[in-house]
């Protein structure tokens, strides 16, 4: 199966990322601590933002279905932008399946805690998760469900986007202000699955020729298919109503959502 790495400013590069777990059973026993995994939609989701084409977007709900969330220890750092294979010495299943609302909480809220489990100490330097269709709750039947409003020049669109593009991400080290995943015996550490929704809509604060905008769909193509002040669509309707170019771009930008902080992930489909 071909896997593709998605990053904020890099081209899509082939990468073989199926973890080789043959060495896991041979890993030595170690003392344990508590390992957390959090989900983060960043300020774009919690505070709202302006799209590349000037729409002010605010979210009421951003439901994301996540499953098989696994943390890995590996002797060598895993780079999803190469064709290297992830060879873990330890793996921990942290979340079986869960739907989270990334828009939950105030603007300054912490990333959402999905779960914490007892885990062997060590450095967790890779993270994997799948995004299947939710089996229950308000987003049942969909992978992503975005609910909110968009406004531009006095026009308001109340939108509900139900997206069902299933995905699997394999990611390397978290990249951010703090190191994550270093678990000392008897202590606690965390990892983060990060979602960059500016990849879909672009960023009005970035230059038009910035890579975040040149690859983004924006909101204008979605506003154009709204019925009055309402847009309530699923993927089948989007495929029918958007131009082929815009629909393909939407699919590509959805695929590029998954990160670990600013760190990149390799994408594999689930078929």
Task: Go through each PLM region and give its residues.
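Bacterial lipoprotein signal-peptidase II cleavage site
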Residues: 6-17
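Bacterial N-terminal signal peptides
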Residues: 1-5
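Low-complexity, Ser/Pro/Gly/Ala/Val-rich intrinsically disordered tracts
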Residues: 8, 20-26
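A short, solvent-exposed, low-complexity linear motif enriched for acidic/polar residues
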Residues: 24-271
């Amino acid at each position: 199966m071909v896997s593709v790495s998605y990053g904020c400013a890099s081209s899509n590069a082939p990468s073989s990322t199926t973890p080789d777990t043959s060495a896991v059973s041979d890993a030595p026993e170690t003392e344990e601590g508590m390992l957390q995994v959090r989900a983060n939609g960043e300020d774009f989701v919690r505070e709202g933002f302006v799209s590349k084409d000037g729409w002010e977007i605010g979210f009421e709900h951003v439901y994301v279905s996540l499953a098989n969330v696994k943390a890995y220890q590996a002797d060598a750092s895993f780079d999803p932008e190469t064709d290297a294979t992830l060879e873990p010495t330890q793996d921990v299943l942290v979340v079986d399946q869960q739907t989270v609302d990334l828009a939950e909480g105030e603007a300054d809220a912490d990333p959402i805690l999905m779960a914490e489990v007892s885990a062997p100490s060590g450095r967790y330097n890779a993270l994997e998760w799948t995004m299947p269709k939710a089996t229950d709750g308000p987003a049942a039947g969909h992978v992503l469900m975005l609910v909110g409003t968009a406004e531009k020049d006095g026009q308001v669109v109340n939108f509900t986007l139900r997206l069902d593009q299933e995905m699997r991400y394999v990611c390397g080290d978290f990249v951010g202000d703090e190191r994550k995943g270093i678990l000392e015996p008897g202590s606690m550490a965390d990892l983060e699955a990060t979602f960059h929704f500016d990849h879909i809509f672009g960023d009005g604060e970035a230059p038009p020729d910035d890579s975040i905008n040149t690859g983004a769909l924006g909101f204008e193509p979605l506003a154009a298919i709204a019925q009055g002040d309402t847009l309530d669509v699923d993927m089948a309707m989007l495929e029918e109503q958007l131009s082929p170019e815009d629909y393909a771009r939407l699919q590509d930008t959805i695929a590029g959502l998954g990160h670990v902080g600013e760190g990149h992930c390799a994408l594999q489909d689930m078929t």
